């Protein structure tokens, strides 16, 4: 996408960043990140919800290959939360699963900060 920039990092670093942020958004349902990261994260998260809404084995395996194997709580992992809770929550919605709320700029480097949260 045009709004994600390299910032001196390679593709593996950016992919790992998006995988971690996607997993954390599923677990916490809200994150405070920079505006550029939030816009890129929205694209990956929407794809995960689309896979969860499909619900077949192939979709589950695709999502498992992207998400980190982290416990969302004592009973379920992030993948289980995605397929069991979030897929049902968004089954009648065709997109736009997140909202981005602007905050003040970060104090150290004046980067535009936002909160990305699930609707």
From Swiss-Prot:
Q: Name one GO cellular component term.
A: cytosolic large ribosomal subunit
Q: Which UniProt keywords apply?
A: Ribonucleoprotein, Ribosomal protein
Protein name per UniProt: Large ribosomal subunit protein bL17
Question: According to the entry, what is the taxonomic lineage of the organism?
Answer: Bacteria, Bacillati, Mycoplasmatota, Mollicutes, Mycoplasmataceae
NCBIfam families cross-referenced by the UniProt entry: L17
Q: Does the record carry Transferase as a key word?
A: no
State the oligomer form and interacting partners: Part of the 50S ribosomal subunit. Contacts protein L32.
Q: List the gene name.
A: rplQ
What HAMAP family does the annotation carry? Answer: Ribosomal_bL17
Question: Can you tell me which family this protein belongs to?
Answer: Belongs to the bacterial ribosomal protein bL17 family.
Cite the InterPro entries for this sequence. Answer: Ribosomal_bL17 (IPR000456), Ribosomal_bL17_CS (IPR047859), Ribosomal_bL17_sf (IPR036373)
């Amino acid at each position: 996408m045009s709004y994600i920039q390299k910032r001196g990092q390679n593709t593996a670093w950016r992919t790992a960043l998006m995988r971690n942020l996607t997993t954390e958004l599923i677990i916490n349902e809200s994150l405070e990140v920079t505006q550029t990261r939030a816009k890129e994260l929205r694209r990956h998260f929407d794809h995960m919800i689309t896979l969860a809404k499909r619900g077949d084995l192939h979709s589950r395996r695709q999502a498992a290959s992207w998400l980190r194997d982290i416990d969302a709580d004592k009973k379920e992992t992030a993948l289980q939360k995605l397929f069991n809770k979030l897929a049902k929550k968004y089954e009648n919605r065709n997109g736009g699963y997140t909202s981005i709320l602007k905050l003040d700029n970060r104090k150290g480097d004046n980067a535009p900060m936002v909160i990305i949260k699930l609707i």
